[in-house]
Amino acid sequence: RRDIRITQCITDAKGDRSRPPGKQDDPDAYVHVVSRQSDGVVIRGAKLHITGASLGHELMTIPTKAMKAGEEDYAIAAMIPVNAPGVKIINTSYAPRHHDLRDFPVSGTDNYPEGFVIFDDVFVPNDRIFLNGEVSQASVFAHSLGLWERLGGLSGMADGADLLVGLAQLIAEANGLAGEAHIKEKISEMIIHATVVRACLEACLMHAEVGPFGAAFPNELYTNAGKYTGAANFNLMVRHLHDIAGGAVVTAPAIADFENPEVGHLARKYMAGRSDIDGEYRTRLFHLIRDLTADSYGGWQLVTNIQAGGGLYAQRIVTRRHYDLERAKQVALAAAGLGAHPDH
């Protein structure tokens, strides 16, 4: 049985962002066709930020944006084997290096290589090409990835928001401050954020639309509004968590320090919070908070929360496009007693 893993590759190197693909000083700034022959094409360029590129079997390479007349060579979409001649992948990772993985409870085990995928004159046979010069269809490919990427991001944000709430409550209890009004206020705001993000996730699935071939697509309005809400408010939720937890988020002893015969018992003594809270227990909470929000995984998440599936501006555009603004205008006119809009 073939268990083929496909990695979608969309974001180009882009070069000068103020110029379209066809007006770059370096034509390779966007993946494009450099030669055509009867049995296929040869492509050149690079795709950036491709999570897990080296772990899959196939690279589904698609345009990163809409193309126009004159940019036919950039309107290329194809399925390329990861080991095809000319494919080169540079990997980076936020995995901790040379550290005790007990101090990195998330990034020590859950980490992904980020691939910088280079197509150095790669031949693609005709039967692996989906789009070949049809500029009017380039944006369809680009948009299709954005929707699913944002749905995945929204799903992760919903679970992640609940995790931040749980950590905030646990560390507040360990610190003996769970009853303080300002702590409860911050956690309440985190709870509201988590609830709204999950509500958007559930709404986009409940209002999914079924296409002509039977495939279900999440509702674009709720998907994009939810992704925007989760990303735009993430930093504030992390700030609340850090404020509740305290400076030990970045200064707590390593787990190995508790095993040191000279200082282990002292670390356990002074890292304790309430009398019934063990010092190592509290320290492990700090390590999880640090790893999630202020270190290896946390740094990666801070960026990907904003950039995955397109930045905040992209979500604002799509949300506005799918919101029924005309209906809202009619509701306002009716409320004002003005009847129908003059344009109708």
List the model feature ranges, each with a label:
Residues 46, 50-99:
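A short core secondary-structure module
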Residues 221-344:
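Alpha-helix capping/hinge segments and adjacent helical runs
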Residues 185-210, 228-236, 240-242:
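Loop-to-helix element that buttresses phosphate recognition and phosphoryl-transfer chemistry
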Residues 100-195:
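Glycine-rich beta->alpha junctions and the first turn(s) of the following alpha-helix
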Residues 1-44:
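Gly/Pro-rich turn-and-neighbor structural signature
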Residues 4-6, 39, 57-59, 74-78, ...:
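Structural beta-strand/beta-sheet cores of well-ordered domains, especially the beta-sheet scaffolds
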Residues 169-178, 201-212, 244:
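Secondary-structure edge/capping motif, primarily at the C-terminal ends of alpha-helices
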Residues 184-188, 216-224:
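Short, charged, amphipathic alpha-helical segments
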